[in-house]
Each structure stands twice: as structure tokens, then as C-alpha cells.
Regions:
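Single conserved hydrophobic/aromatic residue that forms the stacking wall/gate
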Residues: 1-7, 11
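Short, mixed-charge, low-aromatic patches
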Residues: 14-20, 46-51, 149-158
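General N-terminal targeting signals
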Residues: 26, 89-91, 140, 147
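Glycine-rich loop at the start of a catalytic domain that most often binds anionic cofactors/ligands
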Residues: 21-29
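Conserved alpha/beta enzyme-core scaffolds, especially Rossmann-like or related mixed alpha/beta domains
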Residues: 9-16, 30-92, 102-117, 170-182
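Alpha-helical recognition segments enriched in aromatics with Gly/Pro capping
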Residues: 96-99, 106-182
């Protein structure tokens, strides 16, 4: 029965996503422009009130939700990726990489299919979220190998602890897996 189980509202902020363009309705647009493609949690708050743009946005969302007077749990993607909370799910994605690509690739346009990977590495030198094709899976070390267009070199990164993030479709499935949502 629908009401026989306890339920809780969990709100997730996708604050590991790279910002693609400068919102026109915010101050300090030059500050944002120089930080494009970085996770929202790595971009300074253009309003100058919080540590990051994501913290600013997260606080606005929390204030909004409090107005409805119901209990909720608020979680930051950045914190969950970096703390290792998602590591079990990331490993499951890694171990099923080919099967996942076989499901996702037919849903993408031709250009995107050529560069798609469920994993998006975070560039160690620039901090940007990279949308690059994974060249190799290092199965023994649980790392992805890719060509970094910023450094013009082949690099690798661990799939764990916030060194990369997942594309949104795979990210949602991973969250449901880790959180035990059925």
C-alpha cells in the first residue's frame, strides 16, 4: 500500500555540473565567465555572500523549501562525490561500462556519440568538467584514461572521490542504486 512505508523527501543539488554559460541576471559576470565549465561548487559566489555559486543557490533552495513546512533532507552532489558516498555506485557503473554505453549511445546524436562517456573527468589543472571520450579503462586501478584538450596530453583519473562525475542519465541511476530507491 502506498502509505504503509515511511517516505522522506531528499533534494539533491547537481552542484558538480559544469556551468556552460553566464546567466544574464547575476552580478559579476566576468567572474563567472572566467570559471565556465567548472562545477558550480568551484565557482565563486557572484553575489559575494557564500563560498561558491552552488552554496548561494543551495541556500536559496533550502529557504524556499522551508516555507512549505515539511521535513526534507538536502544533499550536495559535490559532498557526496568527494566523500566517497557514491563510490559503490561509481564502481558498478565502471564494471558495467560497455553495457551502459550500449544503452545510452543510441539515444544520442551522431556528434555526441563520438565523444560520449558516462564518466566526466575533472581537469586537474583547470578544474573544468571535461566532456571527453574515455580511451581506456584501467580495470585494476579503477581509473579512466582520456585525452585532455586543455593540457594537450593523455591523462588518467580515479573514478572515485570526486575526481570525475557522471553524465546526468547515468548519475540518476547511480543515485537510486546507492540510496536504495526502488
Amino acid at each position: 500500500h502506498l502509505f504503509s512505508s515511511a517516505a522522506s523527501d531528499v533534494y539533491k543539488r547537481q552542484d558538480m555540473d559544469g556551468l556552460r554559460k553566464v546567466p544574464q541576471n547575476i552580478p559579476n559576470q566576468d567572474l563567472i565567465k572566467e570559471n565556465l565549465e567548472k562545477p558550480l561548487s568551484s565557482i565563486p559566489d557572484p553575489f559575494g555572500k557564500f563560498e561558491s555559486f552552488s552554496e548561494h543557490n543551495n541556500n536559496k533552495l533550502i529557504d524556499f523549501l522551508k516555507g512549505f513546512e515539511f521535513d526534507f533532507i538536502f544533499k550536495s552532489s559535490t559532498e557526496q562525490y568527494k566523500s566517497g558516498k557514491f563510490n559503490e555506485g561509481l564502481e558498478a557503473i565502471f564494471d558495467n561500462y560497455e553495457d551502459i554505453c550500449n544503452v545510452i549511445l543510441p539515444t544520442l546524436g551522431k556528434d555526441r556519440r563520438e565523444t560520449y562517456s558516462p564518466f566526466l573527468p575533472i581537469c586537474k589543472s583547470s578544474g573544468k568538467v571535461l566532456q571527453v571520450k574515455v580511451k581506456e579503462l584501467n580495470k585494476s586501478q579503477k581509473k579512466i584514461v582520456y585525452f585532455n584538450p586543455i593540457t594537450n596530453s593523455e591523462e588518467d583519473c580515479s573514478i572515485f572521490n570526486g575526481e570525475c562525475k557522471l553524465q546526468w542519465k547515468v548519475d540518476w541511476a547511480m543515485r537510486w542504486y546507492v540510496l536504495g530507491i526502488d
